[in-house]
UniProtKB/Swiss-Prot annotation:
UniProt source species: Cupriavidus necator (strain ATCC 17699 / DSM 428 / KCTC 22496 / NCIMB 10442 / H16 / Stanier 337)
Matching NCBIfam families: frr (TIGR00496)
A single GO molecular function term of this UniProt record: ribosomal large subunit binding
Subcellular localization, as worded in the UniProt entry: Cytoplasm
Protein name, as recorded: Ribosome-recycling factor
Length: 186
């Protein structure tokens, strides 16, 4: 394994960490409605748990209301229960075959709590990126010890991985700033 291979592998893993962080951020509720909010909701479909997107069409009625239309009429109750039981504090209302999910306004206190949650998630993502940097540096040391690469190559590789780490940590910080702005916007 060369410096380039190690760098490429680390970059792919860092990108996956960013994607996971992005998915975690999407689950954090802001005052506005978006269909991605319900992506992780699991519905009991004849005894097996399936994502809501497999049993219903999820859309937006307006900026503060999500509409969910189950494909089978008899699934309306199960879908409504799944939305109510998810940890987002939502209160769906059924109107015929359509379930309307209004987004309650966030209190100032809840907004501050959510920004703390976002910062906590960000710290976890940064730790993951830094751990990948550490693993890469250990890999470089091993390659030097095995005399596969020179110490100059090791230093160059460590510098490149550090630049990647800085880039991804900055990207995480940028995403946090955007999410906090979104949460604090009334």
């Amino acid at each position: 394994m060369s410096v380039a291979d190690t760098k490429k592998s680390v970059e792919q893993k860092m990108q996956k960490s960013i994607e996971a962080f992005k998915a975690d951020l999407a689950k954090i509720r802001t005052g506005r409605a978006h269909t991605g909010l319900l992506d992780h909701v699991q519905v009991d479909y004849y005894g097996s748990m399936v994502p809501i997107s497999q049993v219903a069409a999820v859309g937006l009625a307006d900026a503060r209301t999500i509409t969910v239309q189950p494909w089978e009429k008899k699934m309306v109750g199960a879908v409504e229960k799944a939305i109510r039981d998810c940890d987002l504090g939502l209160n769906p209302a059924t109107m015929g075959e359509v379930i309307r999910v209004p987004m309650p306004a966030l209190t100032e206190e809840r907004r501050k709590e959510l920004t703390k949650v976002v910062k906590g998630e960000a710290e976890g993502a940064k730790v993951a990126v830094r751990n990948l940097r550490r693993d890469a540096n250990e890999q470089f040391k091993k390659l030097v010890k095995d005399k596969t690469i020179s110490e100059d190559d090791e230093r160059r590789g460590q510098d490149e991985v550090q630049k990647l780490t800085d880039k991804y940590v900055a990207e995480i910080d940028k995403m946090v700033a955007e999410k906090e702005k979104e949460i604090m916007t009334v």
